Amino acid sequence: MMKTKSEVLIFFFTLVLLLSMASSVILREDGFAPPKPSPTTHEKASTKGDRDGVECKNSDSEEECLVKKTVAAHTDYIYTQDLNLSP
């Protein structure tokens, strides 16, 4: 029985689609997927809160306190962005 061109085209398209999906799953199982954040890193970030080394005393206004915290966080980011903190 002779197949039409459209049936052959659909067959090859489906085959390519299935192979590409299978190859992406295999690559992810081998460790080529982006790393997942560890729970300890997430816990440290969530429990850190306002304890970032900047203390706002009662004499500081809310705006001054926010500026101090922003500068401290930015400085921390600058000096730690090249570090590999993953365990």
UniProtKB/Swiss-Prot annotation:
Tissue specificity statement from the Swiss-Prot or TrEMBL entry: Expressed only in roots.
Entry GO MF terms: growth factor activity
This protein's name: Phytosulfokines 1
Species of provenance: Arabidopsis thaliana
Any one GO CC term of the record: extracellular region
InterPro entries (alphabetical): Phytosulfokine
Signal peptide: 1-24
Keyword tRNA-binding: no
Entry keywords, A to Z: Developmental protein, Differentiation, Growth factor, Secreted, Signal, Sulfation
Prosegment residue ranges: 25-76, 82-87
Modified how: Sulfation is important for activity and for the binding to a putative membrane receptor.
Positions carrying Sulfotyrosine: 77, 79
GO terms, biological process: cell differentiation; cell population proliferation
rRNA-binding is among the record's keywords: no
Subcellular location: Secreted
Residue ranges, compositional bias (Basic and acidic residues): 41-59
Role noted for this protein: Promotes plant cell differentiation, organogenesis and somatic embryogenesis as well as cell proliferation.
Xref: Pfam families: PSK
Annotated segments matching region Disordered: 31-59
Family listed: Belongs to the phytosulfokine family.
